[in-house]
Amino acid sequence: MEPFSKFFKSFRRYHRFHPLDSSSASDDELAGKYEEHLLMDERLKRETVIFKSRIWILLTITNLIILGITVSMIVTSHCQLYAGKNADLRPISWWSPILDAIEIPTYETTLNGTFFAKPEVSIAREEPGPENDADWEQYETIRTHIVSREDILRLGKDPDTVMRFDNDYWGFGDDAYMVQLDVMHQIHCLNMLRKAAFHDYPGYVPTGAHTDANNTHASRWTHLGHCVDILLQNIQCNANTEVITLAWVEGRTQPWPDFSVNRKCRDFEAIYKWQLENSVDAGKFDRMPIPHDAYVWPAPWENRESELGEKLGKHQKQEGVLGQAGHQHTKRHE
């Protein structure tokens, strides 16, 4: 408060009333006093400017301090929100039980983007046949996992319509719901497209799950169309930003793309291992009866306007918030 008191003391001193004795004061004395008052006014103006400047500096410093505290609180809350396992993945992922269960490693690698297969190839480059189909088959048994009602809400789904593990059959209690890893469904779809693409490969007869000898069957084409669509949506949703370089090669007048780009990847093997170690018995799942009190949706092939209660093309929910639209043609299994 010292600058304020000093300012007001100066103000009172410079503006104190000084009566003039007109009878005795000479012109020179009056002129001197007038100049003295002018100097006092100039000094007061300077001190007023300094005072205002100090006020603005003080306000600026105060605002900067408040801004710093606010930013610090926001950063701290953000760090706390994504603290724990998979802190780097959570901001770009919808909640999943596996994010809480294990730390999913990430690593840097160079993808094998060569046009011609290398000697040691992945199952995607193997010659189509029974052995190759068997390698793909390990991904076709999509395992099922247990989550709670609260977890279903975090997924943005309605627990009243999601399949539960019947306690009489499974013995998991009343708060046990069924989920499966979406990435495994994507690999299944890729395998479906692989079989369709190579169905006329010399000597190849597709085997394994979801193999239909009648390639013109309507449901098969619907299945393939679904797989193309779901893979495209996933590619677009997870659109990577890496770039491809180009090169000149002998005997070609057009650029040759180098698809072997450097990538940062999630460890799929860690996810696959978790799926195997934390799933219910697959055989028992296949033999599972429909519980008497199960929620049963109308058959999608009989109601083309909606599927599982959602208008087609209207899947735009927010995490943890259930849709407001009512379920259509809902019923309980009797």
Swiss-Prot record:
Positions of glycan attachment: N112, N214
Transmembrane segments: 55-75
Pathway: Secondary metabolite biosynthesis
Disruption phenotype: Abolishes the production of asperipin-2a.
Pfam families membership: UstYa
Keyword Transmembrane assigned: yes
InterPro entries: UstYa-like
Topology in membrane: Single-pass membrane protein
Superkingdom to which the source organism belongs: Eukaryota
Region (Disordered): 306-334
Molecular functions per Gene Ontology: oxidoreductase activity
A single GO BP: mycotoxin biosynthetic process
Domain notes: The 2 HXXHC motifs are conserved in ustYa family proteins and might form active sites.
Function, in words: UstYa family oxidase; part of the gene cluster that mediates the biosynthesis of the asperipin-2a, a bicyclic peptide that possesses two macrocyclic ether rings consisting of 14- and 17-membered paracyclophans. Within the pathway, aprY is responsible for the synthesis of the bicyclic structure of asperipin-2a. The pathway starts with the processing of the precursor aprA by kexin proteases to produce 11 identical copies of the hexapeptide Phe-Tyr-Tyr-Thr-Gly-Tyr.
Family stated for the protein in its record: Belongs to the ustYa family.
Protein name, as recorded: UstYa family oxidase aprY
Organism of origin: Aspergillus flavus (strain ATCC 200026 / FGSC A1120 / IAM 13836 / NRRL 3357 / JCM 12722 / SRRC 167)
Phylogenetic lineage: Eukaryota, Fungi, Dikarya, Ascomycota, Pezizomycotina
